A protein has these predicted regions:
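Phosphate/pyrophosphate-binding loop motifs in nucleotide- or prenyl diphosphate-using proteins
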Residues: 1-217
């Protein structure tokens, strides 16, 4: 009969260029709302690529926090009337305070031109820069949607702050990577210049010690 079997992922509606935002409603995939929701979902995926190479548990936790907020934002765009999908103003405050913290360090260590570094200083910063480009594109889609459909002000502010946070995070990752490289380069030099340990000759009547567990380990 051409209908999908129960339990399958596909419905066939998308074959005609349509998709569902709410149960029972279908809109064109070219609709501004679909573009904005898709942009938020792309941003979640891009941040997942950053998280794959993140070894710092604290920063990994921040990425999960942002991904979770973006999913709430996407759901809110799909179902704006329900009022169920909202996030606290603390999420915006978190981005602002963490951005200020990183910018403060970068300004102190790199000077006022810290933003000018090219992407690619390390893998994590490159992925952060790519994620920032995705977020900025999603923000533009959100603004395009707002011209036709009302978008909550907090959503627009959040996407704008998120782009700033990712810029600061990318340059911060570059700085941390360079600090680690400098530290690694200094360590061999320190080892070479360290004074050699004095060798004390054993007494003539010393008895050789066999390979016990203590002196093997």
């Amino acid at each position: 009969n051409g209908k999908p079997e129960k339990g399958t992922l596909y419905t066939g509606n998308g074959d005609k260029g349509l998709t569902s935002l709410l149960p029972g409603s279908q809109v064109s995939k070219a609709d501004e709302r679909v573009a904005a929701i898709g942009g938020a979902e792309e941003s979640v995926a891009a941040l997942g690529l950053v998280r794959c190479v993140t070894v710092c548990p604290d920063f990994a936790g921040k990425l999960v926090r942002v991904q979770t907020t973006l999913r709430t934002l996407a759901a809110g765009l799909a179902d704006p009337r329900s009022g169920k999908f909202v996030f606290s103003s603390e999420e915006i405050a978190f981005l602002e305070s963490d951005t200020d913290r990183m910018v403060g360090v970068l300004a102190d260590k790199r000077g006022s031109d810290w933003q000018g570094a090219l992407p690619g200083g390390c893998e994590q910063s490159a992925r952060l820069d790519a994620a920032r480009s995705t977020v900025r594109r999603a923000e533009r889609a959100l603004i395009a949607m707002d011209r036709r459909y009302a978008v909550p002000g907090a959503f627009k502010v959040y996407m704008n702050r998120l782009g700033d946070w990712l810029l600061a995070a990318a340059r911060y990752a570059d700085w941390l990577s360079e600090e680690e490289k400098d530290k690694a380069a200094r360590e061999p030099v320190a080892a070479e210049t360290a004074p050699a340990a004095a060798v004390v000759p054993a007494p003539a009547d010393a008895v050789p010690v066999g390979p016990t567990v203590e002196n093997v380990l």
